[in-house]
Structure formats: structure tokens, C-alpha cells
């Protein structure tokens, strides 16, 4: 594991950490019971099988 030779300043630490951002999931349009809905791509298969109720998303 890398060990820093010198202490990183608070400003540099916070600038580096600010680059880590969460982004919203990409939404895909899927038709369930004749009603088009936008849902996250990773949930499409479960919604089509009826494992997840799209009303609760």
C-alpha cells in the first residue's frame, strides 16, 4: 500500500474529494400493463417479471 511522504493540505484533500460525485441512474422507458414508465436499466428485467411494483419507485 502506498504511504504518503508528506501530509496533504486540507485544501488539496477537499479538492480531490470533491471530484467523487454520485450520478443519477440512466432511465429506460419500459411498458408495463400498457403504461410507459421510465425506470433504471438494472431494474427492467425484474419489473417485466413482476418482482418489483413500478408504482412504488
Swiss-Prot record:
<dbReference type="Pfam" id="PF01783">
    <property type="entry name" value="Ribosomal_L32p"/>
</dbReference>
<feature type="compositionally biased region" description="Basic residues">
    <location>
        <begin position="1"/>
        <end position="20"/>
    </location>
</feature>
<protein>
    <recommendedName>
        <fullName>Large ribosomal subunit protein bL32B</fullName>
    </recommendedName>
</protein>
<dbReference type="GO" id="GO:0006412">
    <property type="term" value="P:translation"/>
</dbReference>
<dbReference type="GO" id="GO:0015934">
    <property type="term" value="C:large ribosomal subunit"/>
</dbReference>
<dbReference type="GO" id="GO:0003735">
    <property type="term" value="F:structural constituent of ribosome"/>
</dbReference>
<dbReference type="InterPro" id="IPR011332">
    <property type="entry name" value="Ribosomal_zn-bd"/>
</dbReference>
<keyword id="KW-0689">Ribosomal protein</keyword>
<dbReference type="InterPro" id="IPR002677">
    <property type="entry name" value="Ribosomal_bL32"/>
</dbReference>
<feature type="region of interest" description="Disordered">
    <location>
        <begin position="1"/>
        <end position="22"/>
    </location>
</feature>
<keyword id="KW-0687">Ribonucleoprotein</keyword>
<comment type="similarity">
    <text>Belongs to the bacterial ribosomal protein bL32 family.</text>
</comment>
Amino acid at each position: 500500500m502506498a504511504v504518503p511522504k508528506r501530509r496533504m493540505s486540507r485544501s488539496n484533500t477537499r479538492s480531490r474529494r470533491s471530484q467523487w460525485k454520485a450520478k443519477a441512474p440512466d432511465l429506460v422507458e419500459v411498458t408495463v400493463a400498457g403504461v410507459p414508465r421510465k425506470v433504471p436499466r438494472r431494474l427492467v428485467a425484474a419489473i417485466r417479471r413482476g418482482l418489483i411494483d413500478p408504482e412504488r419507485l
